[in-house]
Amino acid sequence: MATGRRKANRTKKEETNWQERVIQIRRVSKVVKGGKKLSFRAIVVVGNERGQVGVGVGKASDVIGAVKKGVADGKKHLIDIPITKSNSIPHPIDGVGGGAKVMMRPAAPGTGVIAGGAVRTVLELAGVRNVLAKQLGSNNPLNNARAAVNALSTLRTLAEVAEDRGIAIEKLYI
């Protein structure tokens, strides 16, 4: 029985590094035979500020339940991103999610996160401190968050590019 207790403590410690932020809570309705059934949809971003981030959506009859489901969904859809020493992204990148397009560019140390809305939340919880980002197309928070995650998931380090090409990192730009 003592081993079960230790495992429970370990999982609690692991869960404390995750931060979650609610991007949007929206009341939605479903038309049924007896009238309209109201429920809530929560869009939640989960991250550890050390290169892992995920976007989740939860629906429930109450707000708290929707947020809990959103957090669980976000943890299921986590991605790892490479972060440079200057807490930026390695290279310029574009992402698409639905009708939303997101453009991200690395920035010099001290610039901060210059982004709006859902994209800013995703970048902050991913641990990116210096970046320039622009939302293009849709201003839907869910699609913009998904576009940001799509962009971040395609980031690659110099070592990964050199390995894919089968050459040494030193010869990459010669």
Curated annotation (Swiss-Prot):
Where are the annotated coiled coils located?
none
The lineage's top-level taxon is Bacteria
Q: Which UniProt keywords apply?
A: Ribonucleoprotein, Ribosomal protein, RNA-binding, rRNA-binding
Q: Name one Pfam family in it.
A: Ribosomal_S5
Give the UniProt record's GO annotations in the biological process aspect. Answer: translation
The segment(s) forming the S5 DRBM domain are 18-81
MF terms (GO), sorted A to Z: rRNA binding; structural constituent of ribosome
What is a single cellular component term in the Gene Ontology annotation? small ribosomal subunit
| Listed Gene3D superfamilies | 3.30.160.20, 3.30.230.10
**InterPro entries xref list:** Ribosomal_Su5_D2-typ_SF, Ribosomal_uS5, Ribosomal_uS5_bac-type, Ribosomal_uS5_C, Ribosomal_uS5_N, Ribosomal_uS5_N_CS, Ribsml_uS5_D2-typ_fold_subgr
- Family statement: Belongs to the universal ribosomal protein uS5 family.
Q: How does it associate, per the subunit comment?
A: Part of the 30S ribosomal subunit. Contacts proteins S4 and S8.
Domain topic, free-text comment: The N-terminal domain interacts with the head of the 30S subunit; the C-terminal domain interacts with the body and contacts protein S4. The interaction surface between S4 and S5 is involved in control of translational fidelity.
General function of this protein: With S4 and S12 plays an important role in translational accuracy.
HAMAP family per record: Ribosomal_uS5_B
The name under which this protein is listed is: Small ribosomal subunit protein uS5
* Source organism (scientific name): Nostoc sp. (strain PCC 7120 / SAG 25.82 / UTEX 2576)
Organism lineage string: Bacteria, Bacillati, Cyanobacteriota, Cyanophyceae, Nostocales
Q: Which gene encodes it?
A: rpsE
